[in-house]
Design a protein with these regions (language model features):
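Inter-motif core of Ras-like GTPase G domains
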Residues: 148, 167-184
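N-terminal phosphate/diphosphate-binding loop that engages ATP/GTP or pyrophosphate donors
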Residues: 44-115
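Gly/Ala-rich phosphate-binding loop of Rossmann-like dinucleotide-binding domains
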Residues: 43, 171, 199
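C-terminal lobe/tail of nucleotide-utilizing enzymes
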Residues: 6-7, 196-267
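Cytosolic-facing regulatory segments adjacent to core modules
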Residues: 98-110, 119-157
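Walker A/P-loop phosphate-binding motif and the immediately C-terminal alpha-helix
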Residues: 20-54
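Short, Lys/Arg-enriched N-terminal segments with co-localized hydrophobic residues
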Residues: 2-18
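Conserved beta-strand segments of the P-loop GTPase G domain that flank and frequently precede/overlap
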Residues: 121, 179-182, 208-210
Length: 267
């Protein structure tokens, strides 16, 4: 099931675009999987891709991309505690807000690169009692708002599970929101809330139905808050699930991801 309007495909054919995309959803719905597969598909089309790991609890995205985990970007600003101290003094936001970034500006020590895909990480929780993730959220909020893309560049943000990032204002800096839905009541309910939040900040959003089977496809489609916003249905693929389980680089090229890629390039 794909919403891929032929009019827009023809209208935008050959047009160079740039886009910042937030990939959202509940924990375990497949955000990292879709982000990885989409990044690879865009890169195969000659686009320059920045993947932003914005989930402090996720230790698998870099492996799905076949890369090493990059150094925490928060360290570039002196580390979590330094950022928190500056936040208390209202220095950090003022300083960082005035600084614009491009993909080329990201210091080499803070990204991994493979096959046209550059990966950066806001930061991870590395040990017990080290504090909250507010510093990483502040860094990402300012970074994505001040990131300037060139033609044929895409930034894909693999967001933390849930909707806290909306409260932090991170999504204000993106151009489009992808909401991943798995076959569960919790995922469907959260996707409705994310859709409402997206509309409240005037951001276009689309649904990706994930882990779809013949038995649940119709049920999922009918249960979605706004079915006209369903972009694609991604079938439950044993090969993808197996590679993810073993922490291997994803090698599959699902038709649904190819269709999603063409759809995003058309809007």
């Amino acid at each position: 099931m794909v919403i891929c309007n032929a009019y827009y495909l023809e209208k935008r054919k050959g047009v160079n675009i740039e886009m910042k995309i937030a990939v959202c959803g509940k924990g375990g719905c497949g955000k990292s999987t879709v982000t990885s597969l989409l990044a690879k598909a865009l890169a195969r089309r000659g686009k320059e891709i920045l993947v932003i790991d914005s989930d402090e609890s996720n230790y698998g995205l870099h492996r799905q991309l076949g890369m090493k985990l990059p150094r925490d970007f928060t360290d570039y600003f002196g580390g979590k505690q330094n950022v928190l101290n500056d936040m208390m003094l209202s220095k950090f936001t003022h300083q960082f807000f005035e600084e614009t970034w491009t993909i080329d500006d990201i210091p080499e020590d803070y990204y991994s690169l493979k096959d046209g895909v550059k990966l950066m990480s806001s930061g991870k929780i590395h040990q017990a009692n080290e504090g909250c993730s507010c510093a990483m959220g502040t860094v990402m909020t300012q970074f994505i708002q001040n990131l300037r893309l060139k033609e044929d560049q895409f930034a894909l943000m693999d967001m933390e599970a849930g909707i806290e990032h909306f409260g932090r204002g991170i999504d204000n800096g993106v151009d489009l929101i992808l909401i991943i839905i798995d076959p569960s009541y919790e995922s469907l309910q959260l996707s409705k809330k994310i859709g409402e939040l997206s509309e409240s900040i005037q951001k276009p959003f689309y649904y990706v139905l994930n882990k779809v089977t013949k038995e649940n496809q119709e049920m999922m489609y009918e249960a979605v808050w706004n079915s006209s916003r369903v972009a694609v249905s991604l079938s439950a693929d044993p090969s993808i699930m197996g590679e993810g389980l073993m922490g291997k680089e994803l090698s599959e090229k699902p038709d649904a991801i190819e269709n999603l890629t063409e759809f995003l390039l058309s809007i």
